[in-house]
Amino acid sequence: EKYNLGLLGIIPSIGEVKTHKLLNFLKLVDEKKMQGGVRRRLITRENPKSPVSESYRSLRTNMLYSSSEKEVRSILVSSAGPGEGKTTTVANLAITYANLGKRTLLVDTDLRRPVVHKVFDLEREPGVTNYLSGQTSDYQSLVKKCEIDNLSIITSGIIPPNPSELLGSKRMMNLVKQLENDW
């Protein structure tokens, strides 16, 4: 109320996910990848009928219809500190958009503690920092496919010594504009 912002959704805590038959059935994650809580981040893929998955779909729908004038082309998820659910939120939101048949691109701009590549079992490099630091001028060479239809990912790339400067650069603004036009 203080900032006159509307509420688009509330995502409950995922908690522990049962691993026995569900993961074997989906064949999404093998035993090695389940360590470290990575498996539970993709709740919309692992357990699409759960209340948490429904909350992500509700959030997606509310975001789709929150602007009647113009289609939302990009979404930024941030928080004040680590471990607050940014990666889990963006991964599940991206899956819900892709499940609608929308061509979806998830860009990991957590340049300090990137995890998106682990969640989707992808190589971290090359990624967005390779583009921002001028190592490549073709962002399309960074786009990686994953197991989920309609979902592509640009991983973070190398961990730079100057993440704030890279994210605030003109090259980053140009990348966002290009991505909004192309995706």
Task: Label each region the model flagged.
Residues E1-R103, T109-V115, L122-E125, P160-M173, ...:
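Short boundary/hinge segments that flank catalytic cores
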Residues E1, K145, K177-W183:
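Short, intrinsically disordered, charge-balanced linker/junction segments flanking boundaries
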Residues P126, L132-I159:
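Nucleotide-state-sensitive switch-loop elements of NTP-binding domains
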Residues R103, D149-S152, E180-W183:
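Loop/turn-to-beta-strand initiation segments
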